[in-house]
Amino acid sequence: MQLEKQLQHAQCTFPFSHLGLLKTDNAFTITAWVPNATGIKVIDLATDKAIGSLKRQAQSDLFTAEFTKGNPPAVYAFEVKNAQGSYRIIDPYQFQDQAFHAVHFVDHLPKNVYQQLGAQLIDLDVGLKTPIAATRFAVFAPNASAVSVIGDFNYWDGSCLPMQKTDFGYWVLVVPGVKAGDKYKYQIKDAHGNELPHKADPVGFYAEQYPSHASVVFDHEQYQWQDTKWQQQVKGDKYTQAMSIYEVHLGSWKRPDSQSGKTYLSYHELVDELIPYVKDMGYTHLELLPISEFPFDGSWGYQPVGLFAPTSRFGGPDDFKYFVDQCHQNGIGVIIDWVPAHFPEDGHGLARFDGTHVYEYEDPRKGWHPDWNSCIYDFGKDTVRQFLVANALFWLDKYHVDGLRVDAVASMLYLDYSREADEWVPNVDGGNHNYEAISLLQWMNKEVYSHYPNAMTIAEESTSFAKVSRPVFEGGLGFGFKWNMGWMHDSLHYISKDPSYRRYHHGEMTFSMVYAYDESFVLPISHDEVVHGKGSLLRKMPGDEWQQAANLRCYAAFMYAHPGKKLNFMGNEIGQSAEWNHDSSINWHLLDYDKHSGIQALYRDLNTLYAEYPALHELDHDPAGFEWIDHENAEQSTLAMLRQSKGGKQQVYALSNFTPVPRTNFRLGVKAPGEYSILLNTDDKQYWGSGHSQNKTIKADKTPWNNQAYSISVSLPPLATVFILYKGQ
């Protein structure tokens, strides 16, 4: 195909071989492709004088001229005439070296992916008084026959700015004058010349919402962070610190007034409303359902397309930085859900990016997820591995987030996950472990903890895969923490039973301690447990209205007593009646009722108690911090445990009664003589409890009980958990 037709039909693979300034022995040639131009002059920008005119080639939009006198200009512009008048543009095709710079080091370090690819704002220092502001575009499309950058700056015309293909499958171009805020996409032709749906930038930093889904050029260097004090505070051992996580879907935590005409609160409005609430409630961390840009609201963010762009539903990238910054200035850590397991088929996204399987496994037995109707990343492909690890580092680097909760880890680890016998491909050893995904997760964790030792990674992993939260050098996956899905499943199953039947399920509340120290666990009552017909946490509880609330309070306090960091989804803390709906707000009006405000008050006090008493958090992941005092009283459905700090310096007993029967003069074995005091009783009237009488201070006597030399007699309220502090002799 002739060059003119290649350019006209956006089918030019190597424009640098034809356009721009090309030197010969004793001359230089300048060639331009400017659709709809009627004339072009070449302006030497060093002198701002014309050095000649380009001649149209055979009534085409291709213009060229050979210059046999003088030296080539260091940098030049075109004075273009067309039917509407004239304008000046700086020729993109003279900056070939600067364009190639994007891919010189991209494979060396994961961070280079977001520092070199995508739309990078650069200053071209070409000897002028002021550098030329430009944007360097670089995108990976190894099997495309042609790629053009299209956007506001060229009227979305794919014939205007063909990109240059490099030896490594990247396409590059520097475009002067493209600035922050300009919208763009890539027009890609597959290997056969067929035009694909216009693609958003895989490394785009900002994205528009439906219907355009366009990428937006963004400058990451403008925001001035104010969280230095926080960065100093977070140094330390995460395993011995209190961690109470409030899991939030930003789009439905609270909605604007219906008369505002807005669908969502903005990041700035969430700063004003969400942060004070979280701080007042005593949570240490926010965990946000996926922030990466996603097209479908109903996916809650778990079908992301723009991995490097915070969703613009609530504002721009700097607005999200401000949100994180303000969280830190208020002493709140920020964890984001991160989704490296799969991605959706949306036409503007990664699926068949250049007409081939660039990002996903080609074989559908590995590359298609039957549960979510989505594509699975090719975890064995170097460019994909770099892309994903880079994205993990990106959020820690550019947005200062404190941790990543990695979604759907089990689906990555197992080749036969949710597949029938004939629907999966064994690994090289004939097994079902995905070695490529395993090594990717190990690499990601090593990179995160190497560059950001104060950060944390948390795995949502629902199987018994070994050493998920153990270091890679010990043969583990390298995560900092793992969700304890077993505890969640067993304890919710138990608490949903009528109290009269709980005696037959007693082991469901104690079995978790058999494996409690195999991993570094987070106890999660997450969004997954209050959707899809499962009902709200309150509605899982049996009994009448009072018993449901009492069961929830008893269960919540048992969770805070149990070893492991804590996570609760929004709405749990007010005893929301309806299950979560992403299209509407939490039912905040329920706080007008004592039942719900009482539950909220309990969660607030549990967070305070958990943070203030080292016995309840310091040894969450050390067997020395826990002892069953009585875990065998199935007949009365009671449980008693001891939590203690390092060296036993502080001792807190937790006693739970999972029946509606009050237990007067209930005897509890204790370690030492002396005085004990009630720290918290979930049956107190302030929590909408019955206010069952209870002495605040109790003396131990030398009555052996529960294999202890001493014991105390307490009044154990119905459906309640009581925390008791040993004060000393």
From Swiss-Prot:
UniProt key word Transferase: yes
GO terms for cellular component: cytosol
Top-level taxon of the source organism: Bacteria
Transferase recorded as keyword: yes
InterPro entries tied to this protein: A-amylase/branching_C, Branching_enzy, GlgB, GlgB_N, GlgB_N_E_set_prok, Glyco_hydro_13_cat_dom, Glyco_hydro_13_N, Glyco_hydro_b
Residues annotated as catalytic: D407 (nucleophile), E460 (proton donor)
Keywords, alphabetical: Carbohydrate metabolism, Glycogen biosynthesis, Glycogen metabolism, Glycosyltransferase, Transferase
A Pfam family assignment: CBM_48
Gene3D superfamilies reported for this sequence: Glycosidases, Golgi alpha-mannosidase II, Immunoglobulins
Reactions catalysed, as given in the entry: Transfers a segment of a (1->4)-alpha-D-glucan chain to a primary hydroxy group in a similar glucan chain
Enzyme class (EC, first level): transferase
Assembly, per entry: Monomer.
Protein name: 1,4-alpha-glucan branching enzyme GlgB
Protein source organism: Pseudoalteromonas atlantica (strain T6c / ATCC BAA-1087)
